[in-house]
A protein has these predicted regions:
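Conserved signature/switch motifs of ABC ATPase nucleotide-binding domains
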Residues: 151-152
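Catalytic Walker B motif of ABC-type/P-loop ATPase nucleotide-binding domains
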Residues: 157-161
Length: 245
């Protein structure tokens, strides 16, 4: 059965991931509604990357269940990934190709490719489109990956710390323009980020991971109303001061 009848794009139930004796995720449950901007927060090592790997069908859990559009991504990865755009934490592309060449290559592989839309986003991010990927800054590489991830009009966009290495102008473009634009169009966005101030006004729902467990999972507005504090202060109060967000 197609997952299109479900109200959730992503549903996670009691998900546990282990690496040897180390437990990376411990009975994690969450649900990402269609059209929502969902923020997953946590310190480095909290388990965010493990959850994303499961979501993308790259990691098989030790226990529990994860469904994407109603299907198991581990068993249905090719079909599901055609509906998903991904921006990894570490940008990766053929080093000798420019952004223009990468977009052209993607266009030859995907009939739904919006080359004009990709070019416009690269212009917004002020990326030199004829410069080889290996010569771009880390922030520029991330901007290229974001523009390419949106090129086929995905139903779900997965962003793994998309503003890391970006300057203020580019961060504002990612949060204010790209994520806001996608939310207005009804695209579901699943984002991990260290930029809590940037995501606070855009996320509909938020989960906080600590030690592989979900310690907060609720609507952003309800969370802020309950605590009567900014998101950064709530995060620190929940997980403590030590380490990077």
């Amino acid at each position: 059965m197609s997952g299109d009848v479900t109200p959730e794009v992503l549903a996670v139930r009691d998900l546990t991931v282990r690496y040897g004796r180390q437990v990376a995720l411990d009975a994690v449950s969450l649900a990402v509604p269609r059209g929502a901007v969902y923020a997953l927060l946590g310190r480095n090592g909290a388990g965010k990357s493990s959850l994303i790997r499961c979501l993308l069908g790259q990691q098989h859990p030790a226990r529990g269940r994860l469904s994407l559009f109603g299907l198991d991504p581990w068993r249905n990865r090719p079909a599901l990934m055609a509906r998903v755009g991904v921006v990894p934490e570490t940008p990766d592309a053929p080093p000798e190709l420019s952004a223009d060449q990468l977009s052209a290559l993607c266009g030859r592989l995907n009939r739904q490719w919006d080359r004009a839309g990709v070019a416009e986003r690269l212009r917004r991010f002020d990326v030199p489109v004829r410069t080889p990927f290996q010569r771009l800054s880390k922030g520029q590489k991330g901007a290229v990956m974001l523009a390419l991830a949106l090129g086929h009009g995905p139903e779900l966009l997965v962003l793994d710390d998309p503003t890391l290495g970006l300057d203020v102008v580019a961060r504002n473009a990612v949060f204010g323009e790209v994520i806001g634009e996608l939310a207005d169009r009804g695209t579901t966005v699943f984002v991990t980020t260290h930029d809590l101030a940037g995501i606070e006004g855009l996320a509909d729902r938020v989960a906080i991971l600590s030690g592989g467990r979900i310690v907060v999972e609720e609507e952003m507005d309800a969370l802020k109303a309950r605590w009567a504090r900014p998101l950064e202060e709530i995060f620190t109060a929940v997980v403590g001061e030590k380490g990077a967000a």
